Each structure stands twice: as C-alpha cells, then as structure tokens.
Amino acid sequence: MSLLTEVETYVLSIVPSGPLKAEIAQRLEDVFAGKNTDLEALMEWLKTRPILSPLTKGILGFVFTLTVPSERGLQRRRFVQNALNGNGDPNNMDRAVKLYRKLKREITFHGAKEIALSYSAGALASCMGLIYNRMGAVTTEVAFGLVCATCEQIADSQHRSHRQMVATTNPLIRHENRMVLASTTAKAMEQMAGSSEQAAEAMEIASQARQMVQAMRAIGTHPSSSTGLKDDLLENLQTYQKRMGVQMQRFK
C-alpha cells in the first residue's frame, strides 16, 4: 500500500458515511494526484462543510496544507488552529511538545506512527497544531504518520461506541437503527438508479421503503416490525443491478 493510499484510508475512516464522505474522498484523491492546487479554495470549501466535527475538519485541513503546494506567506486558517489546540488543555500541550521532540528525530512514516500511537488523541491533535502553526517542522512523511495515528485513536473510540450500539439489547434502539439503515439504503438506491428505463422500478422500491419508514415512525410500530427491512431493500437493489449487468455482491 502506498503512503498516500494509507493516509487516505485512515483519514476517511473518521468521516461519517454519506454523500459528503464520497465528496471528501474525491477531493483527497485529486489533492494526492496533484490535480487540485488551489489551497485557499479547498480550505474555504472544507470550512463550510456541514456534519463534520471541528477536529475532523482540522485534520483534513492539516492534510490539505501538507499536500497542496502554496505560497510561503499563505495565512493559516483559524478553524484548523482552533481544532488542533488540544481543547486548550495545558497537559495536552506539554505532551505534544514531548512528542514533537521525538518526532523530530524520526524520518519514516511508520516510525512516527508507532511513536505517536502511545499518546492520547488530544496530545496528537496539539502536536499537529504545533506543526500547522509553523512552531515546529518535521518531514511530510513523519507528519502523515502523526495524522494516521490520530485517526486510528479516533476510529478506535468510534468503533467501540458503534459496537455498543449494535450490541445493545434495547429493542427500541435496535428498531430505530434498522429504520435509519433502511432509509439510508433507500436514499442510496435513488442516487444509484440514474435515469435509465429500469431505474424507474428501483426508484419506486426506494420511494416506497422511505414512505414505509415514515409511516412506521408516525404511528409507532412494534420494535420487531423493522426486522429484515434493510436486507429486503438490498435484495431488490441487487436484482436491479443484475438486470443492468452490474455484479456487486458485497453490500450487506
């Protein structure tokens, strides 16, 4: 796996799924391929994105700044600085300085990532802030190692939280989660359907599924009524894809 592929993988792992994630993935691909060279426009676009947490925006802004060539005097962005200040906690800043001193002696991506993984996400973000604010300089490879370690820490805690929700025995939460997934799947089907003749059928199925979820929420149905809802939708989607000559099995 190339270095940039690894960075893209880690960064995207902390972005919530949805149309915005696809958009960010495209921007990262363009930046890493050298196709997007307007850092100012890129940062303005990032700043105004909804849904993303300030820290995720800060990390993305840091990655864009590392990758896109820019004039030396280009102003640092406040939204990135605020996100990478370790919540203003002096302990985070102390640890960040210690980490920075270690990273300065490191030259490889994997070496830097290994060192950084023993620090908390707050200290890692503060260390990124030091580098972003030009208070310290490390090689790009080392900076990317720091980014990936931070994303791994964040993704770990997100995964724990997700696992808790999936494993919950509370029927109401499970019911709502199944309806949310069915609704999201229906939305994705509508986007994939396009404008072909067969698309009308897929659109109709997706639309009916969304109306059904709305009705279930409006009248308050039994928690078991949503069982299999998403899987039924996915079966319909795969039937439609086969007719279109597309073979993509791994949606479940």
Curated annotation (Swiss-Prot):
Function as written in the Swiss-Prot or TrEMBL entry: Plays critical roles in virus replication, from virus entry and uncoating to assembly and budding of the virus particle. M1 binding to ribonucleocapsids (RNPs) in nucleus seems to inhibit viral transcription. Interaction of viral NEP with M1-RNP is thought to promote nuclear export of the complex, which is targeted to the virion assembly site at the apical plasma membrane in polarized epithelial cells. Interactions with NA and HA may bring M1, a non-raft-associated protein, into lipid rafts. Forms a continuous shell on the inner side of the lipid bilayer in virion, where it binds the RNP. Determines the virion's shape: spherical or filamentous. Clinical isolates of influenza are characterized by the presence of significant proportion of filamentous virions, whereas after multiple passage on eggs or cell culture, virions have only spherical morphology. Filamentous virions are thought to be important to infect neighboring cells, and spherical virions more suited to spread through aerosol between hosts organisms.
Other facts noted in the record for this chain: Most abundant protein in virion. When expressed alone can form virus-like particles in transfected cells.
Region Membrane-binding, annotated ranges: 1-164
Source domain of life: Viruses
Family statement: Belongs to the influenza viruses Matrix protein M1 family.
Regions crossing the membrane: none
Alphabetic keyword roster: Host nucleus, Membrane, RNA-binding, Viral matrix protein, Virion
Motif Nuclear localization signal: where in chain: 101-105
Gene3D superfamilies membership: 1.10.10.180, 1.20.91.10
GO cellular component, one term: host cell nucleus
InterPro entries: Flu_matrix_M1, Flu_matrix_M1_C, Flu_matrix_M1_N, Flu_matrix_M1_N_sub1, Flu_matrix_M1_N_sub2, INFV_M1
Pfam family, one: Flu_M1_C
Region (RNP-binding), start-end ranges: 165-252
Compartment annotation: Virion membrane; Host nucleus
A GO biological process held by the record: viral budding from plasma membrane
Membrane topology of the entry: Peripheral membrane protein
Protein name: Matrix protein 1
Keyword RNA-binding carried by entry: yes
MF terms in GO: RNA binding; structural constituent of virion
Broad class of the protein's primary localization: virion
Subunit structure: Homodimer and homomultimer. Interacts with NEP. Binds ribonucleocapsid by both interacting with genomic RNA and NP protein. May interact with HA and NA. Cannot bind NP without genomic RNA.
